[in-house]
A protein has these predicted regions:
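Active-site helical microenvironments for divalent-metal-assisted chemistry
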Residues: 1-275
Length: 275
């Protein structure tokens, strides 16, 4: 089994052993406390807590001796996908970005927002591989974060509890291995190749947690009560958008119909010049 950190204490010990300064370790601690609030109650289909995966991703990055800003970003890399900011909407907005900036600083936040915006699919991997040399420094760093994330997902075979993951590795694995090599991290490339090979040869795992969720999902305490405005306002907002879009389509169709009728009338014999 792998030796990467899965808890905050293990990560802090690793950072100290890897030579990160006390100031660096404090930055990571602050990000971890922020992550605890963002990802409370999140689990993977394997039953693994989401925060363990985040710590593992940061640990992979720390083992590569990257700047602490990248390690910190790795610890909250899914903020805009799965983070709960306490408001109506998730995702990237000026409000959520400001919260992340206040918690970890603008440089780390820039990594996180670029991570979320980077296209990531086996279909796009050949393009990324061919254009690595043309990427900016920060986008190369973000690409490395993406690779660290996918390695961590597979280290303990936890990815096998998710549907279609073998196909994902089969189609995208070779390109990811090549990307790590091209970025200048041969040890990461070799480890990814080894782990991906094991993933593809493993039999279905068990026992399985009793969930049908395909990806990260939320488990809340029984005492949890949903706030009305958080639950129903987004639904009302989506309904209003659907109604508005429907009205726009009807207006467009009606406008075309009226123009068509007017054109037909204008072309009828005897219409022009009639008094």
């Amino acid at each position: 089994m792998h030796s990467y950190a899965q808890t905050n204490v293990q990560l802090f010990n690793q950072l100290r052993c890897e030579g990160y300064s006390k100031k660096d370790r404090e930055s990571v601690r602050e990000a971890y406390e922020f992550a605890l609030r963002l990802f409370t109650g999140l689990f993977f289909p394997s039953g693994k807590t989401f925060i363990d995966h985040l710590v593992g991703t940061a640990s992979v990055l720390a083992s590569l001796h990257v700047p602490v800003e990248m390690v910190t970003a790795g610890l909250i890399h899914a903020a805009y996908l799965h983070g709960n900011f306490g408001g109506i909407r998730k995702g990237i907005s000026e409000t959520t970005r400001n919260q992340v900036r206040l918690a970890v600083g603008p440089e780390v936040e820039e990594y996180v927002v670029r991570y979320e915006r980077m296209p990531w699919d086996p279909e796009i991997f050949p393009v990324l591989l061919d254009t690595i040399d043309k990427l900016s420094r920060i986008d190369r760093d973000v690409l490395l974060m993406r690779l660290a994330n996918d390695l961590e997902h597979n280290l303990d075979f936890g990815s096998l509890y998710r549907d279609n993951w073998r196909e994902y590795i089969q189609h995208g694995g070779p390109a990811m291995v090549s990307m790590a090599e091209k970025l200048g991290f041969p040890s990461l490339s070799a480890e990814m190749a080894s782990v991906f090979k094991e993933i593809l040869t493993q039999a279905p795992l068990g026992p399985r947690i009793g969930t049908s969720e395909p990806a990260a999902y939320l488990i809340v305490p029984k005492s949890y009560h949903e706030r009305f405005w958080v639950v129903y306002l987004p639904k009302a907002h989506r309904l209003c958008l659907e109604i508005l879009n429907t009205l726009r389509r009807l207006r467009w169709k009606g406008s075309k119909l009226i123009h068509g009728l007017l054109r037909a009338l204008s072309e009828m014999p005897g219409v022009h010049g009639r008094r």
